Swiss-Prot record:
Residues 10-286 form the tr-type G domain. Coiled coil: none annotated. This is Elongation factor G. Catalyzes the GTP-dependent ribosomal translocation step during translation elongation. During this step, the ribosome changes from the pre-translocational (PRE) to the post-translocational (POST) state as the newly formed A-site-bound peptidyl-tRNA and P-site-bound deacylated tRNA move to the P and E sites, respectively. Catalyzes the coordinated movement of the two tRNA molecules, the mRNA and conformational changes in the ribosome. Keywords: Cytoplasm, Elongation factor, GTP-binding, Nucleotide-binding, Protein biosynthesis. GO terms for cellular component: cytoplasm. The gene is fusA. The keyword Mitochondrion does not apply. InterPro entries: EFG_II, EFG_III, EFG_III/V, EFG_IV, EFG_V, EFG_V-like, EFTu-like_2, G_TR_CS. It holds the Pfam family EFG_III.
Length: 701
């Protein structure tokens, strides 16, 4: 089975499968692996035995958390699939896998259409400009409606779908698809052995008109993409299948439209045509623009690397997983050049040398060792010590840093403490390993209580991390109540705040004087929450002490001024100062910088910010009033109401602090008939009465 890596990159596809929870993403991946001959037994998510869900908890919860990269072959082409999680708490995983993909298959639930989470993942894919094809899954489900789903792609995603298949029958009678490119029907008769064989037949008479109508739309769209085709089409000539496919491919690769296919992965119908579409329409590594980066240490000097083995080696580490036998596995996407296993490379992001141990192409949880890694492919590497996600590996003689990925700050925190002394040490190791794998998982020591506090993107995110500590690292820990990650900021600009740090106790003293202006930082580039500008002239503060003032200010920001929450969105400008030949030191200026910031911030109308969540509740109409009333009582702001397949959808912005335990309340108010999803939206100022409570609680008054 172990076929070698293909050298012809035209025949390689690096794709992801993205979807809402339960739209059937993992099942779809499983079927792909089955038909491409990698898997000998079809795994069902229902039995908890699917190949890509390889962590215990994923099997238990039936959701995919870590994206395993899987390689398979189809008709002489190689497909590298990265399974992405659809649950919002794992957005960092999704973003990270999108970064290294060339194309994606968006799986939608044929009954629900575009759901909130699929919308979010879609927006993330837009950010990285990933070409996509859409697969409308679960066509065998009660209430499945292909045309409704296509409409939601237009309405909710604002995207342009291009229908290239129509379903034959629906729900229990779903038996196949009409291929609008080849103008024939493919049907899976009866319970054929796992749907491997399908028959190509004529289009059923009752669907002929509909097929003709959609075929015309398809031809018009394709013809408009190319002058030569347009002339041919307007002249009444037939376009050949190859011409149509080339036209669709061109539009898809340019992300101008998204071909839509349909099927039922669970019932094994429509999977092979989807694989054909992946090869026909999604880009190969050669169709994608050259990857851009910069010279290490000089962000303004841009360089690019073409996806060719003749270029110097460069690769991006996009995932780290702990493997039971090999220890740390680093997944990398090679963008240029090639390299042997055992070779030495440089981690340009950190400026450290690394040696590549063994190289593998992964198949979910089985490994296929390879000797060399070449451009355009995805590998797992053993033996990298200092490399974390988002780092660039490259040729020591020709260094490049591929853009780094920026990760969101955690919105929820819990205190965690080991149950016994022996757990104490293990907890440290466990937290460190998990933080390496997941940059949105943050850890800090609470100075006042001495507790370890972990932060993440949501309750589920932290639940799963604590669960992994128990299973993988055998750490028993007590977890406190979730705490909201508040922030502090200032509202007005305060100029020329002066602070002098003086200490004279015999021997050399300490002396530093700084004058700063502190102001709110608005719309910073790349989401930065702090900026430092130096405007000192004439050496009144020596050059070597300026970074110390900056460091001192950043230190003070960690601990806030109102209630001990970190200060954000602040710009500090150092205007002037004074120093003493003997008594000045880096330490003295650090203290001065820190105290000056505190003094300025207190005068700058400080306020507390809280995370607001975008909440979407789907409820039967009878409970609409209760749901809205409840959201209002939680300080929620209702933003929109709409109807979706017979139910009502309420969209609101609600402070995270008011959303704890919402699951239970919503169930009891609606007899379990409503469900909701929430994602972090933004930080906003807290009302005065709430602010008083937070400060009182923090200062213990």
């Amino acid at each position: 089975m172990a076929q070698d890596v293909l050298t012809d990159l035209n025949k390689v596809r690096n794709i992801g499968i993205m979807a809402h929870i339960d739209a059937g993403k993992t099942t779809t991946t499983e079927r792909i692996l089955y038909y491409t001959g990698v898997n000998y037994k079809i795994g069902e998510t229902h039995d908890g035995a699917s190949t890509t869900d390889w962590m215990e908890q994923e099997q238990e919860r039936g959701i995919t958390i870590t994206s395993a990269a899987v390689t398979c072959f189809w008709n002489g082409n190689q497909i590298n699939i990265i399974d992405t999680p659809g649950h919002v708490d794992f957005t960092v995983e999704v973003e990270r896998s999108l970064r290294v993909l060339d194309g994606a298959v968006a799986v939608f639930d044929g009954k629900e259409g575009v759901e909130p989470q699929s919308e979010q993942v879609w927006r993330q894919a837009d950010k990285y400009d990933v070409p996509r094809i859409c697969f409308v899954n679960k066509m065998d489900k009660l209430g499945a409606d292909f045309y409704f789903t296509v409409q939601t792609i237009k309405d909710r995603l604002g995207a342009k779908p291009l229908v290239i298949q129509l379903p034959i029958g629906a729900e229990n009678d779903f038996e196949g698809i009409i291929d609008l490119v080849e103008m024939n029907a493919k049907v899976w008769r009866g319970e054929t052995k796992l749907g491997e064989s399908y028959e190509t037949v004529e289009i059923p008479a009752d669907l002929a008109d509909k097929a003709a109508e959609y075929r015309n739309e398809l031809l018009e769209t394709v013809a408009e993409s190319d002058e030569a085709l347009l002339e041919k089409y307007l002249g009444g000539e037939e376009l050949s299948i190859d011409e149509i496919k080339a036209g669709i491919r061109k539009l898809t690769v340019a992300s101008e439209l998204y071909p839509v296919l349909c099927g039922s992965a669970f019932k094994n119908k429509g999977v092979q045509p989807m694989l054909d579409a992946v090869i026909d329409y999604l880009p190969s590594p050669l169709d994608v623009e050259s990857v851009k980066g910069h010279v290490p240490g000089h962000e303004d000097q841009e360089i690019e690397r073409k996806p060719s083995t003749d270029e110097p080696f460069s690769a991006l580490a996009f995932k780290i997983a702990v493997h039971p036998f090999f220890g740390k596995l680093t997944y990398v996407r090679v963008y240029s050049g090639k390299i042997e296993s055992g070779a030495q490379v440089v981690n340009a992001t950190k400026g450290k040398k690394e040696r590549l141990g063994k190289l593998f192409q992964m198949h979910a949880n089985k490994e296929n060792p390879v000797e060399t890694a070449a451009a355009g492919h995805i590998y797992a590497v053993i033996g990298l010590k200092d490399t974390t996600t988002g780092d660039t590996l490259c040729d020591p003689n020709s260094q490049i840093v591929l853009e780094s990925m920026t990760f969101p700050d955690p919105v929820i925190e819990v205190a965690i403490e080991p149950k016994t002394k022996t757990d104490q040490e293990k907890l440290g190791t466990a937290i460190q390993k998990l933080a390496e794998e997941d940059p949105t998982f943050k850890v800090k020591l609470d100075q006042e209580t001495g507790q370890t506090v972990i932060g993440g993107m949501g309750e589920l995110h932290l639940d799963i991390l604590v669960d992994r500590m128990r299973r993988e690292f055998k750490v028993e820990a007590n977890v406190g109540k979730p705490q909201v990650a508040y922030r502090e900021t200032i509202r007005k600009k305060v100029e020329n705040v002066e602070f002098t740090h003086k200490k004279q106790t015999g021997g050399s003293g300490q002396f530093a004087k700084v004058i700063v202006t502190v102001e709110p930082l608005v719309d910073a580039e790349d989401g930065a929450t702090y900026e430092f500008e130096n405007k000192v002239t004439g050496g009144r503060v020596p050059r070597e002490y300026i970074p110390s003032v900056d460091a001192g200010a950043q230190d003070a920001m960690q601990y806030g001024i109102l209630a001990g929450y970190p200060l954000v969105n602040i710009k500090v400008t150092l205007l002037d100062g004074a120093y003493h030949d003997v008594d000045s030191s880096e330490m003295a200026f650090k203290i001065a910088g820190s105290q000056a910031l505190k003094k300025a911030a207190q005068a700058a109308q400080p306020v507390i910010l809280e995370p607001l969540m975008a909440v979407e509740v789907i409820t039967p109409e009878d409970y609409m009033g209760d749901v809205i009333g409840d959201l209002n009582s939680r300080r929620g702001q209702i933003q929109a109401m709409e109807e979706r397949s017979g139910a009502r959808v309420v969209k609101a912005q609600v402070p995270l602090s008011e959303m704890f335990g919402y699951v239970g309340d919503l169930r009891s108010k609606t007899q379990g008939r409503a469900n909701y999803s929430m994602v972090f939206d933004s930080y906003a100022e807290v009302p005065a009465n709430v602010s008083k409570e937070i400060i009182a609680k923090a200062t213990g008054e």
